[in-house]
Every structure is written in C-alpha cells, then in structure tokens.
Amino acid sequence: MSLVVFTALVGLLVAPVTVHPMIALTGILFIALGAGASGALNMWSHEDIDRVMKRTRNRPVPSGTVAPGEALGIGLALSGIAVVMLGLATNLFAAGLLAFTIFFYAVVYSMWLKRTTPQNIVIGGAAGAFPPMIGWAVATGGVSVESLFMFALIFMWTPPHFWSLALFMKSDYSDAGVPMLTVTHGRRVTRAHVLVYSLLLAPLAVAGAFTGTGGPLYLATALALNGWLLVGAVRTWRRDEAQAEADRYRVEKAFFRFSLYYLFLHFGAILAEAALKPYGLGGW
C-alpha cells in the first residue's frame, strides 16, 4: 500500500499545474482509502488462498481477526466513500479512474485472473499501475504522456518483481492452487520470463528521462538502476536449480528485494526532477 500511495503522490506533485495543498491532501487521502478498500475486498475473495499460504495466513481474515463478511462490508463501504469523496473533492475523471482501479483489482484480478491463468500478474499488473495516473488526474483532470509513462513503468516492473517472488515461494502458490508461472511451467521458464521482461523494462525506464518529468538526475538514476536490474536478471536466469535450493534462493530473494527499491528510486528521481525545476536545475 505504501508504494500505491507514494506513486499516486508523485503523479499528483509532478503534474505541470499548481494544486491547492488541501486538494492534494484530500486527493491522496481518498486514493489511500481506495487502496485499503481494495485490500479488504482482496482478503474477502482470497480467504481460501490466504489461509493456506505461509506469507498470508496471518492476515486479518484467514487468522480469524475479521470475518469474511465483515471484510466484504468494509471493502464495499470504503470503496464507495473513496470514490464519491474523491469526485466531490477533486474531479469526476479522477474518481472514475479510482473506481475502475478498485473494480479491476478486486474483481478482474483477484476473483478471476489470479485463479485462472499464469499471466495473472501480467494483465493484473495494470491495477497496481493506475495510482500515478489517478494522482495526475487529481491535479489535471486528465491523462498525458507523462502519466502514461508512469503507468507503463509500473506495469512492466510487475512481472519480474512477482515472478522473482514466485521462484522461492513456489510451494506456497502450489499448495493454494494458484496457477503462478512457476507452478504451471516450472522455475526454468519463469527465470527466462524474468529476464525477458527485465530486458523490456530497462529501455522503457531509461526512455522516461526524455519525457516532461525526466531530466539528467532521472537519467543517471535510471541508468544505474537498470544496469543493476539486468545484472540481477541475468544472474537469476543462469541459476541452476540445485544451487538455488542449496543456498535457499539467495540470488532470487536479493533480486526481489532490489525490485522494491528499484521502483521507489525511479519515482523518487521523478519527484526530485520536479522539485528542482523551480531552481532551473530539473529537466532538460
């Protein structure tokens, strides 16, 4: 959720318009509320999956802290409040985009894609990529090349991020009956997919330096991060399964952790470029 709020905040702050602080604050508040609503609906629909998986069994619903019906009620109520209040506080386009994001995550991804196809996180990754577009829409009332770039950056980042997790959590997904790529096609194929998507992600991320939100600082950051991304992806791809099991997937876990910092640092660089522009130091 922290990544959702941060990327939405970046999308809002780097838009080329002046936003009243109260509008910005309420916009981020209701986007965060929408993210919380999505999480509640996800826990309701995934109660059977979360109860089996080690990394999710302590969540409120599978642990018994919150009943499934309560999670559903909370999720629906928070969704309605978040969408309506965002529309009243900012604009209808941003509210509509938030409503679509909640629906896509809670219904299309959580209830359908995750349970039916190994491409679940490829298609479903769109849900996590919308927040900066919503933030941008709060500020401008629309979309632009820059907000579409931020969407694309998260969308292309999602598969290697989650597939690297699936490499060392394969048994969890298998036990829960989730058709992750590691379960349906094996780790060798998944490693190749991590490499391919990383090769697609790197030039896209670097190209962002030449959009309206880019600049020399972003370019330097992107070159360094994507160089390291490709090194990690190649190392992950080349790994022998026996070696990976022997060291408990040390390389795969390191790549997964790096991927978290990767996205935060890219968006941090985008935000820094915007902060430097008033002083003539950001952008080209």
Curated annotation (Swiss-Prot):
Q: What does this protein do?
A: Converts heme B (protoheme IX) to heme O by substitution of the vinyl group on carbon 2 of heme B porphyrin ring with a hydroxyethyl farnesyl side group.
Query: A single Gene Ontology molecular function, please?
Result: protoheme IX farnesyltransferase activity
Look up the further comments and give them. Carbon 2 of the heme B porphyrin ring is defined according to the Fischer nomenclature.
CDD domains cross-referenced by the UniProt entry: PT_UbiA_Cox10
An annotated GO cellular component of this protein is: plasma membrane
Give the membrane topology, semicolon-separated if more than one: Multi-pass membrane protein
What PROSITE patterns does its record include? UBIA
Q: Which residues cross the membrane?
A: 2-19, 23-45, 69-89, 92-112, 121-141, 148-168, 194-214, 217-237, 263-283
| Listed Pfam families | UbiA
Q: Which UniProt keywords apply?
A: Cell inner membrane, Cell membrane, Heme biosynthesis, Membrane, Transferase, Transmembrane, Transmembrane helix
Name the gene for this chain.
ctaB
The catalysed reaction is:
heme b + (2E,6E)-farnesyl diphosphate + H2O = Fe(II)-heme o + diphosphate
EC number(s) on record?
2.5.1.141
Subcellular locations according to the entry: Cell inner membrane
What InterPro entries does its record include? Protohaem_IX_farnesylTrfase (IPR006369), UbiA_prenyltransferase (IPR000537), UbiA_prenylTrfase_CS (IPR030470), UbiA_sf (IPR044878)
**Annotated signal peptide:** none
Q: What class of enzyme is it?
A: transferase
- The protein depicted here goes by the name Protoheme IX farnesyltransferase
* Record flagged with keyword Membrane: yes
Query: What family classification does the UniProt entry report for this protein?
Result: Belongs to the UbiA prenyltransferase family. Protoheme IX farnesyltransferase subfamily.
Please name the pathway: Porphyrin-containing compound metabolism; heme O biosynthesis; heme O from protoheme: step 1/1
Q: List the disulfide bonds.
A: none
Q: A GO biological process this protein is involved in?
A: heme O biosynthetic process
| Stored Gene3D superfamilies | UbiA prenyltransferase (1.10.357.140)
Kindly state the subunit structure of this protein: Interacts with CtaA.
